[in-house]
Amino acid sequence: SVTGKVHPKQFIANNTAQIGDVIILTKPLGIGILSTALKGGLLKNSHLNSMLEGMLTLNLKASRLAVKFKTSAMSDVTGFGLLGHLKEMLNPQISIRIFENSLPLLRGVRGYFDIGLIPAGAYQNYEFIKKSCPHLQENTLLFCSPETSGGLLIALDEKNANALLK
């Protein structure tokens, strides 16, 4: 958690997404998977560099753009993984459709995931999310994996999303 002051007009909650919003993910996923491979002594140097680059990329520019383009809701992808933080953005009127093939992954992540290098936290997150999403498939574990210095999930209307992405 963070304690600090924010200007009331720049505060963006994580649970105020609107029907019809587009959600943008600002950084690739997979730091949790790659760090598990590192702990197991299996991470290739090229993938280590990719992991470190991802962790060292700050969210400052993305957060400033989010304020500029009238974001409805925003969350950082950290310990609850992508799906856990998306769940925080839901309310009874909102559901989210995920286009799995369009989710960015750091280099090497899928290979390490496929051989079972999955952080324990991913299983805990999966069980928690499954309580409210009973049809969740186990192949979504990758998207339950905790992230360190993950990107932002920015929810905003389609017009502002297109402008932000330019």
Write out the residue ranges for each language-model feature.
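Active-site phosphate/oxyanion-binding loops
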Residues: 38-50, 132-136
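Glycine-/charge-enriched secondary-structure boundary and capping motifs
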Residues: 3-9, 68-166
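Residue-level recognition of alpha-helix initiation/capping sites
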Residues: 14, 56-57, 81, 159
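Residues on a specific face of well-ordered alpha-helices
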Residues: 18-21, 27, 31, 49, ...
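Short, hydrophobic/aliphatic alpha-helical segments
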Residues: 18, 57-71, 137-138
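Active-site glycine-rich loop that binds ribose-phosphate moieties when present
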Residues: 1-11, 46-66
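Glycine-rich anion-binding loops of enzyme active sites
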Residues: 1-43
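A structural signal for small-residue-enriched, beta-sheet-centric alpha/beta enzyme cores
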Residues: 29-30, 59, 74-79
